[in-house]
Amino acid sequence: MKLGVNIDHVATLRNARGASYPDPLKAAKIAINAGADFLTVHLREDRRHIRDEDVFNLKQNISTELNLEIAATEEMLKIAKEVKPYSICIVPEKREELTTEGGLNIVNMHSKLSGIIEEMHSFDIKVSLFIDPNINQLKYLEKLERKPDIIEIHTGDYCDNPSEEKLKLITNSAEYINNLGIECHAGHGINYKHAKEIKKIPHISALNIGHSLISEAIFHGLHSVTKKMKMTISK
């Protein structure tokens, strides 16, 4: 199973003092050296953590794949075409939220998403969609004229209050996505304990993990916690 490390909150710490440190690029290189398979950053419309220059700097200077999380806006899609990351992950976004609160509403967006996927593919950029583990939403993937390359299952509800029922929803969703011939990832709120359970689910090929790793890194160092998480999901 692959590990994507989200380094947004390195930038959060930097921006808290309006400083030039800690440097997200330095964090990215440490995570890669410790075993991260790819890097993820979320360029939000309010630039609360990652900034435009961070994204360009990462793309130019890291040795692994860059996954850029963005809202489906003209501004963000334009930036994606300029940066040309390995992949983009389309996420819903509200200015007032502390973090992404849920998955995309495919029911209301399927026609728009088809156009985005086609456009990004013309720039050789893979497209991921961030979706709740809800079969009723996932069914609308079949209505898309152009299929995404990846679906990332939103694991926040499970991680906030784990239960077998919620884990089953993720399992069923991963199976459904796999049957559509789409690669399945998972992310949001995952720590070591959650990772041990989610890694058992068939068809999930990668986890995106950020806040818990950056939090643990305060006490144990980013190299150490990234290496530990990679070992956790690889066993």
From Swiss-Prot:
One of its GO terms (biological process) is pyridoxine biosynthetic process. InterPro entries: Aldolase_TIM (IPR013785), PyrdxlP_synth_PdxJ (IPR004569), Pyridoxine-5'_phos_synth (IPR036130). It is an enzyme of class 2 (transferase). It catalyses: 3-amino-2-oxopropyl phosphate + 1-deoxy-D-xylulose 5-phosphate = pyridoxine 5'-phosphate + phosphate + 2 H2O + H(+). 3-amino-2-oxopropyl phosphate binds at N6, R17, G189, G210, H211. GO terms for cellular component: cytosol. Keywords: Cytoplasm, Pyridoxine biosynthesis, Transferase. The active site is at H42 (proton acceptor), E69 (proton acceptor), H188 (proton donor). Pathway: Cofactor biosynthesis; pyridoxine 5'-phosphate biosynthesis; pyridoxine 5'-phosphate from D-erythrose 4-phosphate: step 5/5. Gene3D superfamilies: Aldolase class I (3.20.20.70). SUPFAM superfamilies: Pyridoxine 5'-phosphate synthase. It comes from the Bacteria. 1-deoxy-D-xylulose 5-phosphate binds at D8, H9, R44, H49, T99. GO terms for molecular function: pyridoxine 5'-phosphate synthase activity. Its EC number is 2.6.99.2. Its main location: cytoplasm. Homooctamer; tetramer of dimers. Belongs to the PNP synthase family. HAMAP family: PdxJ. NCBIfam families: pdxJ, PRK05265.1-3, PRK05265.1-5. This is Pyridoxine 5'-phosphate synthase. It comes from Wolbachia pipientis subsp. Culex pipiens (strain wPip). The lineage of its organism: Bacteria, Pseudomonadati, Pseudomonadota, Alphaproteobacteria, Rickettsiales. The gene is pdxJ.
